[in-house]
Amino acid sequence: MLIKKLYPCTLAIVYAFTLMLPLTGFADDEANTDTSTTSSSTTKAVPLEDVQRFSNAIGEIKKYYVKPVDDKELFDNAIRGMLTGLDPHSSYLDEEEFKDLQTSTSGEFGGLGLEVTMEDGVVKVVTPLVDTPAFKAGIKSGDYIIKLGKESVQGLSLKDAVNLMRGKAGSTIQLTILRKGVNKALTFDLIREIIQIKSVQSKIIAPGYGYIRLTQFQALTGKDMLQAIDRLKQQSGGNLKGLILDLRNNPGGLLDSAIQVSDAFLGKDKSGKPETIVSTKGRLPGSDFTALAKGVDVLHNAPMVVLINNGSASAAEIVAGALKDNKRAVILGTTSFGKGSVQTVLPLDEKTGIKLTTALYYTPSGTSIQAQGIVPDIVVNEVEIPKTAAKPADPTGYSEANLSGHLINKNNKEITKAKNFKAQMDELMHNDYQLYAALTVLEGMALANR
């Protein structure tokens, strides 16, 4: 069975995304791919002494282990060990995990809404998904989960830790977390939910300025985003002056979707050649691949600001990197997660498979973001601006408007609108300073383009 779709790696209710390629994803380019680098290493037979050593290990385990062990369990564990010893993103997919993987793009699942990985024997949070129990509770990217309920995660596999987090919707679980900069452990009591993820959210954030948040990259994210842009254009009277694309806490997903999203805002460079979106390099036949822009910029070069943070990973970094390197958008926020590897799902049979790191991806400038991340053009940290008490009226601020019987200005409605907008901006500054900064930059770019 070939997996022809590009599935995000779902750790069931915890929901872990990785960037993956389908086996047939580069079929159109295979004829031009140099596979000479793979021939010597992939066709060489495994040395007989290694096969014998492996067989001896199985024999000793079956004879002397404290209790009888099923052959299937031994082989499953052997495959799992081979994969986990390579890197944090390669893994064995047993029947349950393989099934979860194939159904994960529906956008609905039960759990906490965390993407996690294993680091030094501890579960590390890559990102909490927006509007999920973990996000609402305040769990952050980079947090380390050290206890699940009363059980320590030390010594557990990632799968075992995930299984402990699973449970019936409505049931509770306590997570104990270590956070950088905090000198004591934090505890969070979470209620599991059936999580429905809408990957595209949009609104007019200010007159003439649109806002789109991509929470992940699903199969229909590109199409849904284009429809959202059409709605924003209609809501702005056909004059969309600029767009904020929010990729914060977006753990990634489908490579094809990331390419579609990037392509919507790119076109041809000054020389008339299609702009590069992303390239991948690896040993799998067809994995040396470059994606080029095919269409026309749907915003007709209207200014853009892209928001990223440490929770922006994988496919989200592809989009940010493509728009940054092609100088299509200003990137604002904090450095992204830095996952620059590509995983391919290789079925072993009808029910199991392996998820194997097969390539690294590169931004249009040829830069790998693996363990480095996308560095924003404008660094704006997540800060909380405290709301201060209203200032007393200035006793010297006396004007015509204070005079009894003054003439009424016919533009009072516009003045009221301006005051209301200022109040909205003040509220935005307190609630989401990064978004406030992005809108301020976007408005400045739009004015400069007049």
Protein language model regions, located:
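C-terminal "post-core" interaction segments
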Residues: 30-36, 52, 201-450
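Flexible, low-complexity junctional segments that flank or bridge functional domains
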Residues: 2-11, 15-243, 249-253, 267, ...
